[in-house]
Amino acid sequence: MTVGVAAPAAPVTPDAGHPFRRRLLEGLAESITERGYRDTTIADIVRHARTSKRTFYQEFSSKEECFIELLRTSNEEMIGQIVAAVDPDAFWHDQIRQAIGAYVDVIESRPAIILSWIRELPALGAEVRSVQRRGIEQFIQMMVDISSNPGFQRDNIPPASRQMALILVGGLRELAALTVEDNKNVREIVDTAVAASIALVAAGAQTS
């Protein structure tokens, strides 16, 4: 199946339990899938959320604030799914494949949101740079933690450095973004991403 930006958005489960806030985030996710973030209006969000503009402004001051919250929660959910998919006692090659497989699973479920995170968030300006950086830092820490698992330790593979983790994060994000933009099957990146990640981790182990 070809994966493109028209695929259905996955449900959003923000930390806040407020039902209207959750519905508004889901409404934005649906509108991004339907027409993209830039063309989405608050009217679109409340239409999908089946609520009112008044309710929207009780939760968020702007479309941008809602977008940032959506991406924050989506990022945390993705990390949670990746961590849950990795068996820390498995051979480290297998752990890398499990992590990348889970990453691709999430992209398949909500390609438009992931693409917005990579492409559209930076265009909002310097005020959201800290949000994007925090998301990247969370991914870096996840990779460092995974590479500290027993499966890596058994083969004397040291934990990934922050620099190595950043290279992996940046490369995977860009590869995934280009694949989605080209309306290709994102599963096609798995073998290449796994091979590149294994090679980079192995090279790092040799130089440490």
Annotate each PLM feature.
Residues 105, 112-141, 156-158:
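Short secondary-structure transition hinges
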